[in-house]
């Protein structure tokens, strides 16, 4: 396995660990989720370039589009929650309540 793949896999693992450690804050969770998506994007580009899958060049772009949509929805949720409650602690929120 090349060193670039090991580094990107390590970045994904660190973002996943950050997601588990900082799960009480919404902003930290969104940043870790974005790091996971970007490392998955780079890994998919490397995989496609190494295996010469010319047909599936659209898959990393689709992943990047979904990551942008996820970030936009997450930031909108963060703004709504911080305007309503004044904090971003996930543990204190009950979003299922009307």
From Swiss-Prot:
GO terms for cellular component: mitochondrial inner membrane; respiratory chain complex I. The chain crosses the membrane at residues 2-22, 29-49, 61-81. One of its GO terms (molecular function) is NADH dehydrogenase (ubiquinone) activity. The keyword Secreted does not apply. It is an enzyme of class 7 (translocase). Core subunit of the mitochondrial membrane respiratory chain NADH dehydrogenase (Complex I) which catalyzes electron transfer from NADH through the respiratory chain, using ubiquinone as an electron acceptor. Part of the enzyme membrane arm which is embedded in the lipid bilayer and involved in proton translocation. This is NADH-ubiquinone oxidoreductase chain 4L. It comes from Lepilemur mitsinjoensis. The gene is MT-ND4L.
């Amino acid at each position: 396995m090349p060193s670039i793949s090991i580094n990107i896999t390590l970045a994904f693992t660190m973002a996943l660990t950050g997601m588990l450690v900082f799960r009480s804050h919404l902003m930290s969770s969104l940043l870790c989720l974005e790091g996971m998506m970007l490392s998955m994007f780079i890994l998919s580009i490397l995989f496609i370039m190494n295996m010469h899958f010319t047909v599936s060049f659209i898959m990393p772009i689709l992943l990047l589009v979904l990551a942008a949509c996820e970030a936009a929805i997450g930031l909108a949720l963060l703004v709504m929650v911080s305007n309503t409650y004044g904090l971003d602690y996930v543990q204190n929120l009950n979003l299922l309540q009307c």
